Amino acid sequence: MPNAQLIHTPNTRDLVVISDGTGITAEKFAHSLLTQFDIRTKTHRLPFIDTVDKAHEAVQRINDLASRAEQQPLIFTTLVNQELGEIVKKRARGFHIDLFNTFIEPL
């Protein structure tokens, strides 16, 4: 049986979902948005990122993905702790969408 891993094609992007909870809702939201575009994604959900050390580990994983991919990863975050969000925003190599600051904060 062939390897079930997704093979990257020019239209495949790494999608990284980072949350201080399970990340399930953020992942569903990200997939809903991305259905508007003709791209395939390989999803990497990083749940329970609730400490500075875990945020740095997440950044390292994202940057490892970015170094191997043709296109920058898409990063969707739902981190309540602003310090953790800033670590990801400033250090991760990818296109970052902070779902809390984009949608929740204006409410």
Q: Model-predicted segments: where are they?
A:
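N-terminal accessory targeting/assembly segments
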Residues: M1-L33
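A general structural motif
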Residues: T12, E70-Q72
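Polybasic/polar functional segments that serve as interface/processing modules
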Residues: Q82, E86-K89, F95
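Long, charge-dense
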Residues: F95-L107
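Metallocofactor- and cofactor-centric catalytic cores in central/energy metabolism, strongly enriched
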Residues: I24, R45-L65, P73-L79, E83-L84
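Short helix-loop-beta junction
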Residues: S32-T41
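Conserved beta-strand scaffold positions in the cores of enzyme catalytic domains, especially
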Residues: T43-L46, G94-D98
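Hydrophobic/aromatic beta-strand patches that form the interior of the parallel beta-sheet core
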Residues: V16, F76, F95-I97
